[in-house]
Amino acid sequence: MFTFDLTRLDPALALSAAEVLDQIGAKTGENGVPVNAKQGGEGLRVSLQDGVLIEYQHKWEFFRGLALARRVLRSGETIEEHPGFYRLGFFEDLSRGAVLTVDSLKKKIRYLAAMGYNAFTLYIEDIYEVPEYPWFGHQRGRYTKAELKEAVAYGKRFGVTLNPSLQVLGHLEMPLIWPAFKDIKDSSAVLYVGKPEVYEFIDKLFKNLCECFESRHFYLNMDEAHTMGLGRRLAKEGYVPKGELLAIHMEHVGKLCEKHGIVPIIATDMFFRPYTAGNGYYSTDTIVPQEVIDRVPEMYRIMYWDYYNCEKSEKSAAMFEHMLQQHERFHNPLMFLGGAWKWMGFAPNNVFSLYSSDFHINGCLRHGIDDISVATFGDDGSEASMFSNLPTLVLYAEKLYKNTTEKVDIEEAFMDLFGLPLEAFLALDCPNRIPDGPDIPNSASANPCKYLFYNDPLNGRLTRLVSHSYKPHFAECEEKLAVWKADRQFGYIFETLSALCRVLKNLATLPLELREAYANCDKAGLEALADSIPGIVSDLDDFTDKFRAQWLRENKMFGLETLELRFGGQRGRLVSTEKLLRLYLDGKLDRIEPLETPLLYPDGKDAAEPDRPVNNYVEYCYDNTLPAGVPHC
């Protein structure tokens, strides 16, 4: 392990450098290798000159250079990089339950700085304080103004600009559940376009965020507003095409942006959906009409987001290329947003993220897109660790600093940054890599570790997808993940997922085994299964404890209640299942009717397909009976 002497640096820079070095497992001390810094010129250069010399243009490059210093010391070779971007950013979803503590935000900032990112965007639908609207973000863990200001100031120390990503059209399910917002509501998630009260509301959002963020680059999104104009507005004013409503809304919001000095950035899917079959975003033949393009005010920057398309098929690759070409027809500055998958359940999808991201970055470089970010989301409750998808962040940095479309090896960079081999974090995917699951190119939203966890023991909608091979698979995953549970920084993530696999090695196949024993009138088998349930419940309790510890280590307490209610519901069903089995075995019940119901494929088809067991949110795992007030997020 190298020790670095920071005494030659400016004191403020040395303080931040010490925090980054500590974060990535390096030591500091006056007897260490001297670190010298020289700002000027273009790009980043790290060499051995009277210790380590870091020559950089921008502050964020210095911290990347600091992280590269150990590589230079090991090899004795100079590293020189000429980044191929204007902005390299990371989007963190803080709106689906998990809200990072300020300490966790700072930890993310230090890691982003060490990788060389210069932007950190907080996706906060209603996760910020707006005093004029006390119900906005109520009981959701919203950040106070003081917390946001603290995070912004901290990022500035490392050259990492914090930006807000908010919603000013759709994706507002959570605040709009409150009666206080009934006057600005069109449908359950979408604002009433054109209504004056809506723009008074947005004005207050802008005002309060401008008090917290120094950056005026605001990501306003306006994406996936599928029911725009189809709710209360339709009933009161009649039908207006979505394209016209979007233009009206952009004009009103644009005036507010001018008032507050905001540079607005919006998603583009709502420009494409009216002209794409099935109201989709991606297509190989959709042509956005020129009149639609011309109606987008020049003040807006546009964001093409794509987490799915890749080289999995000629059609998918062609779709990505066509979408890039369509976006180039707009007269607005273009940015690209890719995905670091962890939003389909308890485990990330690092392997697919690396596979698709390499393709996305190459496309951006070919088309000269220099504003590039990678996002992560927390759909349906933010069940995965907020630090479980780091490999993709490393890939974005390594490729864009090298400005290359060639394959890059991120293993050395990953080990230097996080103190674990890349294979460890790729192993976090294993709970979703079931034996009969889809191959990597088709595995974007595969989440068996979620739907198997929530599948009801007796009434399981998804039991048709279960295989006996899952038991040894999850037993192997349990052991594989436990290898790294002692790691200082991230051991808790491996411990939590190992505990999940310990539950699943018996729970996943329980519904299938119950059906088989019941169908065969195998009462001895049913009794053995009933006897196994208390052990599963005990394992579930242990997983719940470890999951809670993981949550509280990373996040505010808010949002945990939703998942604990779900866990408790499954626990209750297991306890009830054992009791029902005992009643049946004792002759007090004549039948267990759910076990007599034929099994069907949940998607309505009648034959297995390799890519079928994917994308099952918790509401599909059992009847829509979440307790009142518990969001599906």
Model-derived regions, located:
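Substrate-binding groove of N-acetylhexosamine-processing glycoside hydrolases
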Residues: 1-29, 150-153, 159, 199-207, ...
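Short, surface-exposed beta-strand/loop "edge" segments at domain boundaries and coil↔beta transitions
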Residues: 9-15, 36-43, 54-64, 509
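Generic preference for hydrophobic/aromatic residues in regular secondary structure cores
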Residues: 35, 78-82, 96, 136, ...
